[in-house]
Amino acid sequence: MYLSESLEKKYTKETLPARDAQRLAEFIAFGPIVFQVSRLMVKWGILEMLRDEELTIEEVARKADISVYAAKCLLEASLTIGTVLINKATDRFTISKTGWFLVNDPATRVNMDFNHDVNYLGMFDLEDALKEGRPAGLKRLGNWATVYEGLSQLPEEAQKSWFAFDHFYSDSSFEEALKIVFADKPKTLMDVGGNTGRWALRCVDYDPNVNVTIVDLPQQLAMMRQQTEAKTGADRIEGFGTNLLDETNALPNHRHWDVIWMSQFLDCFSETQIVSILKRAAAVMDNDTRLYIMETLWDRQRFEPAAFCLTQISLYFTDIANGNSKMYHSDDLIRLIGQAGLSVDEIYDHLGQGHSIIKVKKMK
């Protein structure tokens, strides 16, 4: 198994003393409470208050407009969680380094909202999802076979957090990705799974000569047209509606494709489905076409916390999204690329929030 240098140091030998290991075990056992306490400390602005000044329990209660009892419960729990510190001489609380990250780190805030609004209730059904290979927790949000079919109908907060999560991770890599994809000045680009058209808009803005075709579900294309309407370059963006879960549905072949782009797309499918999709991509490629696959591959992360986040996100796919996909290890994705009759030309690592781009060509 390939692991980046930092992950190899963390995951191949024991690193915790016994007492620290025991504490982590208890942290896991109380995980739901730890999460909700910390979420409320953020939502009610308490950590932000303690970032700016030391406060007593009574002062926190007054500023947050909660009871002294509620403030005491939250602050004592947060003290043992590790998000606040206490000054013994004055009985005043202040924020810790961990608390600071909860307030100020954009990735942490996005992850917290996503887990509460999209995942939390559904995770009660994770056991069924793992045993049955279906998104058993999705019923907490709506009655669809996959979350993608229901994106336009999700409850407001869930939809907001879902798109914020998706856009945060992809958008942070777009600037570097554009330089890679447009190095050979493509004129035609197929964006498979283009969602709301954010990447397509960046492409037509980046190069005035490129034409983009977004391939996605018809309901997603309707959202895309709303998002791109009247935007600069929108006249060079077209949609192709299809459901790629149906293996009889081919990718568009009405023009020669210089580039095929799949960003955070293949992680939405099982291994068998990925091979099928890649074979259909290969069918519309020639020797000059390049397929760019952008994914957050957990094994290639520079920093260990990113790998932790990604392997946990895999269970969102299991329980909420579709029941059979995950955040893939690069070894697995490379193997599937080969099974589809394609070969890896180059891999670019450490883009944005930990993305990699796999540049793929047809086997000769």
Language-model features: locations:
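Alpha-helical subdomain
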Residues: 1-80, 183, 190-364
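Conserved Class I S-adenosyl-L-methionine-dependent methyltransferase catalytic core
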Residues: 8-16, 22-54, 63, 69-187
